[in-house]
Amino acid sequence: MRTRLISIPTDTFPLDGVMYEPGSKVLGSALYFHGNTMNFYTGAARFLPEAMCALGLVFVAFNRRGHDILSTRASRQAVGGAYQTVAESVADNAYAATWMKEQGYANPIILGHSYGGMLSTQHVVDHPATPALILLSAGRGGIAQDTTGGTEKLFAMD
C-alpha cells in the first residue's frame, strides 16, 4: 500500500488529506467523508485504508473546512467545526470528488461516517453515477427516527 499526503484546492484554502493506493491492480476508488469535528486521520479513517486497498480500491480521506472543533489558520483566522456550514461541507465533498476525477478516479464509492454519512447522501443525489454508498453510523432515518432511544441494543449486555 502506497500512502501520500494530498492537497485539494477550494475557493478559499486547500483541504489536506491522504491517498492510499493498493500495491496490486487498481479496481476502483473510494472517497471517505469524516464525521462532525473529526478529521482524515481519526476514527474509521484509521482502519479503512488497509481494507479498501486489499479490495483493490484507491482510498482517499480528507479534511473538510469544518474539521476538528476549533483551530486557527495563519495564526489568526478561527476555523473548524464551530464555524462550519452545511453548504460549505457539501462544497468540500464536491471539491474532493472533482480532485479524484482529475487524478483519474471518476465516480468513487462514497463512505460517510456520522455527519459525513448525512452529507454523503446529498453527494450521491448530486452525483448519480456514484457506484455505491456505504454509511457508517449515520442517522437511522425512517419512521422510527424520532422515537425514544433505548431499543437499539447497542451494548454486549443487551
Language model features: what each stretch is:
Residues 23-65, 69, 73:
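Short, surface-exposed "cap/lid" segments of acyl-processing enzymes
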Residues 122-126:
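Active-site signature of alpha/beta-hydrolase-fold catalytic machinery across serine-
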Residues 1-24:
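N-terminal cap/lid segment of alpha/beta-hydrolase-fold proteins
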Residues 146-158:
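A catalytic-pocket lid/entrance helix-loop region that shapes and gates access to the active site
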Residues 107-112, 136:
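Short beta-strand immediately N-terminal to the catalytic nucleophile in serine-hydrolase-like folds
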Residues 111-116, 120:
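Gly/Ala-rich beta-loop-alpha elbow adjacent to hydrolase catalytic centers
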Residues 80-102:
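Alpha/beta-hydrolase active-site loop
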Residues 134-143:
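Active-site nucleophile loop of the alpha/beta-hydrolase fold
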